[in-house]
Amino acid sequence: MIDAQEFLGRAVAAETVGAAETVVRESDDDDVDACREAALRLLDAAPRASGALRERLIAKGYADGVVDEVIERLTRVHLLDDRAYAESAVRYCTGRCMGRRGTVMELTRKGVDRALAEAVATEAEQRGDFEDAAWELGRQYARKTRGLDVAVRRRRFWSAGGRKGHSPETLRRVAEELLN
């Protein structure tokens, strides 16, 4: 246990986390180690982009400088790779039949830099991943709506395609082919 004089002599950083909750952390070398351990635990639980990891660590009460130092170190030793995370997330999104716009929104929501999200989405678009996802979505809605009026089938497909972020041109081609 420390005495009052020793406690008052330490530099203390406090940050507001919630509505009225304040987390107090001592600013010393142990803080960097604790932040690194917290970051590794978060990365063990699920892959994350550096932006999302940064938000989580700051919410836990670590200082901006400490968080930036830890993220830079994790990036340098290849434990944190935003590009690999973004590419993996694009595969996940296309597996859910999402389009380019929806995928970019999902990536930025998960803490990926907007420019990187656009670049990875452009690569996927050039490979035809989003086109394939739109066709798969069309096949799903063709099966689900079999027997319904053509106008109803098209409306439901267009609504789903719009929610998932597909371009109108792609949706038009798929609808003309599959939903007549």
What are these regions (language model features)?
Residues 1-180:
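An alpha-helical, amphipathic repeat domain used for nucleic-acid recognition
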